[in-house]
Amino acid sequence: MLSNLIPFDSSKQMDERITDRTIGELIHAAYAMGEVKTGALIVVEQNIILQEYEKTGIAMDSLISSQLLINIFEHNTPLHDGAVIVRNNRIVSATCYLPLSDNLELNKSLGTRHRAGVGISEVSDALTIIVSEETGKVSYTYGGKIIIGVTPGALRERLNSMKTRKDHKETTGLARIWKGRAKHEEKTGK
């Protein structure tokens, strides 16, 4: 499975990963869904391509717009369950299954959506945006940590930091995946 997780081509411009327009659309969609308590899970790829998880969903190749994201996560629509994966300012897949975190230190009140957001951030360098169906709060995960109830400004700041990531971080993403996989394999006896 490790072979399906491929680092981005480092010769690409860093700003190709996420633009100001994409950041604005993600934030607008997240807080619009939060107002009406529509649950959402949006995974923003960084250095590690999440091909393994992308394949579990329905392939898309769409420019990101807040209207499209809101429609994807609308209750009782074919695409509303699972996660959306964003790569290079495009939605590449919807209804994706993600690994759930088995971290016992996570708050027991967190549901499957939040545990999946933490789970993918434990095995990759992706950032996930989570909208709670229960509370409408917007949270994000990164590096196995969850920040609950973030403001639009804090989310914008975090997303902006992704545009200027240094190339030397690529190896830490691979190391995190290997560590996560090894931990999982050890527990399951594979």
Could you describe each region identified by the protein language model?
Residues 1-190:
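Divalent-cation
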